Amino acid sequence: MNTNDLMAKLQAKYPYEKEYLQAVHEVLESIEDVYNQHPEFEDAKIVERIVEPERILTFKVTWVDDNGEIQTNTGYRVQFNSAIGPYKGGLRFHPSVNLSILKFLGFEQTFKNALTTLPMGGGKGGSDFNPRGKSDAEIMRFCQAFMLELWKVIGPDQDVPAGDIGVGGREIGFMYGMYKKLAQQYNTGVLTGKGMTWGGSILRPEATGFGAVYFVQHMRQMAGKDIAGKTVALSGFGNVAWGAATKATQLGAKVIAISGPDGAIYDPEGMNDEKIAYMLELRASNNDVVAPFADKFPSATFYPGKKAWSIKCDIAMPCAFQNELTDADAVEILANGTWLAAEVSNMGCTPEAIAAFQKAGIMFAPGKAVNAGGVATSGLEMTQNAMHISWSPAEVDEKLHAIMSNIHEACVKYGTQPDGYINYVKGANIAGFMKVAQAMLEQGVI
């Protein structure tokens, strides 16, 4: 395999899908040497097959707003790879959603799910619907209209969606209600991220953030150190950042910065239970602003238009969108003396930012490893649904911690360089790829 040749073909075929091409290029660069040591992969054209989704569903979503006006959005489901299990991946409702973003997310999800060692393939979906400023009734009507098409292609052994940006427990509930009506069966295994009263798993809302902090903790332990007493900056203030802030605080770190589209919050006193709970209130307001945090807590200061990375910290954890942390941000982070950066959002750093971190020799880990706790706990929710049982918080947390430990070990196994530096990007990509590639090889050309 020659990465440049394959990328040239994909760029000619999908010239406008920059996010998808970026994700594919990162993986191919990481695996090229290992791949070329396996002629059986080349003979079966594994790479050429693995970079293309198995199926893409695109559909119209028509709904009525509170003013009685008819609105139309586009819905998608990208069923990327089912070599190791049913398609599994979230639904994103955001105006930026397009096919390139969902293909990149589905591609990343394939390897992320493989890293968990749970039997889950990769998929992703969503819509360009913007929940911001919408009433509960409007969101319900949209979710119901969205499910009118999606229900035809999902199921516990076929495709199991979950939440993502713009899709939380409320939206999952609305969609499941419509699914149940259409399918005429009570099958909670068709979606994850459900409410606790009807088949959801303890800790699922917090799981992505919890798992990310566990992964960071393992990274620090590799250096014989801990995260207790260290300062943390997070971007975002939704479920992911909330979970990360909660677990980091529990482990003794001090979360001093969060951010939103309107700017950044700096709180030198760090987070406590009241402040962490208020993050969820801000997200639930649908206003997508973080400034009110500084109005409520006198110790906090709001910086309009700034990012969390402008604040000096030990650990930087982007928790919002793809490519949110740029090369300019990386320069600022390095100048501030940050010694660990971990993507909690999917592909949260640009390639230039990652290169800057690796050149500087600081610890850096990619989203497909760091944020795998979310889908891992979704997998645990699927298991509980299939077995008709419910595990305690301690049981789920123990299993989550063990999964994140195993992912870290896999990254170290494949990512340790001759000079001792751990290239977590390379390690995660190779570990995930090898599992999926071997499964595809054994299942024949399909």
Predicted region positions:
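Short acidic, glycine/serine/threonine-rich loops at helix termini
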Residues: 138, 170-177, 202, 243-247, ...
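Rossmann-like adenosine-cofactor binding region
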Residues: 263-364, 369
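N-terminal ligand-binding/catalytic initiation module
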Residues: 1-202, 435-443
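Glycine-rich phosphate/diphosphate-binding loop of Rossmann-like nucleotide-binding domains
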Residues: 195, 200-310
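Active-site nucleophile and cofactor-binding loops and adjacent substrate-binding regions
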Residues: 68, 164-165, 201-208, 233-237, ...
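Adenosine-phosphate binding glycine-rich loop
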Residues: 2-23, 219-220, 334-446
